Amino acid sequence: VSKNGKVLYSIYDKGSYNIALLDKIFYIEDDFVGYGEDYNSNNELNPPIVELNNSKSKTYEDQFPNMFIMPKLMMDYGTLKPGFYFSSSEIINRLSLFGGASVNKLNDVDLFFIFDFKRFYPTIYFETYYLTRNTTDNSLYQGAYPINDDIKFRLVQFRSGLKLPFYGSLFDLSVTRQWYRAFIQEEVMTNEYGVLEAGAAYDYFRGWSINSAWSFNVVKNTLDKSINPSKGFSLSTLLDLEKNDFIEGLNLSDSGTLLEEFKPNNLARFQINGTYHYELPWEKRWTVSLKTHAGWISDQSVDPFFHFYLGGMPGIRGYPFYAIQGTNSALFDAIFRIPVFREKHYKFKWMIFQNSTLGAIFQAGDAWVDNFSMKRSLGIQWRLNGFSFYNFPTAIELEYHQPLDKFDKEINEEKITYGEKGRAYLKILFDF
């Protein structure tokens, strides 16, 4: 409030906050407001601040709230996987911690930890991931002796880097170290010697990479931006220089210990992504989103382990994840969305739903080594977002996709046909 009675305030209008100025003040009679005469009797009558505040400043000290821990329950490849998330953030977000852990009845473990340090101009971050997977395999030795294999895979990754803002965009420079290891425990049932046991452990992948990424996002901020973006575009590029050692075989040393034989698979990997959002002028919040992706690997003869995979949820969703692969990739994605409801407050148990949309999706693209062959898919999408337990963002997405093109692949001398069946996807996350 200025000396001459003008009021400067913020007002929320058309999906954004704006600064407004009230030139004249009109007093409203208490009878029209609806409050009793003693409504303000308990408020402290503090005088307005009209003099310079001479309080002495002091250096800010980090302040942390208590660690937040939230249990979780996942259904992962047919098994229940209970676990928890933990997080804590400094009051003004100068430092944050986030991690999680889960395990299932097969002793498959998922652990991750993310640390962000934001005291300097660049954000310094560190990430680590630790995963194990257990499986079994049965076979016959010389067609007579049954062999039971207990197989365990362990995946470890460390990543550290800097995030640098630059004229509205963001550079991300990082170094990644990862290695994968396998453990095999065999049991052979024989008539002569009973049960024979043997085991082995070996690394099958070791890799270093230097990563540089750039992203630029000018998508308009609206109340339903996450569920139904309507205006603006985003661009991102990623360049990885990778030094990869991938297992080619196993051998024995002079002392009889197991040795891995690695083959170099060094490469440069480049990717570019773009998204454009547009709101149709004749209907409110009817939107079209266009997405493109292109990728290239410098070594066209690299092992398929390092290929782009363009099926499943991150790619053409009418096909399984491993169905489409290659050293080159291209994808076009068009989504048309209409709102079911907007800015509502529907309560259901511990959840509050605010926005919902229906969408139609068309996808086309391929990942290839020698020849490009178009794969297409049509899908429908339903989205719902809001909050759980009054505080936690909740985003629910259900999709069904039908492939339009059939093709065959030969894997282990077996022909597999893709494109005959549709696929459904359900996601429940904090955001879309």
Residue ranges and their predicted role:
Residues 7-10:
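Residue position within the beta-strands of beta-propeller blades
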Residues 194-227, 314-323, 329-332:
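Outer-membrane beta-barrel transmembrane domain signature of Gram-negative proteins
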Residues 81, 85-87, 96-136, 141-149, ...:
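C-terminal transmembrane beta-barrel domains of outer membrane proteins
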Residues 2-4:
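Residue-level detector of Asp-centered blade-edge/turn motifs that repeat once per structural unit
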Residues 149-189:
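Transmembrane beta-barrel wall of Gram-negative outer-membrane proteins
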Residues 17-18, 23-128, 213-216, 220-230, ...:
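Outer-membrane beta-barrel initiation region
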Residues 166-169, 203-205, 225-230, 283:
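Edge/loop elements at the starts and ends of beta-strands within beta-rich repeat scaffolds
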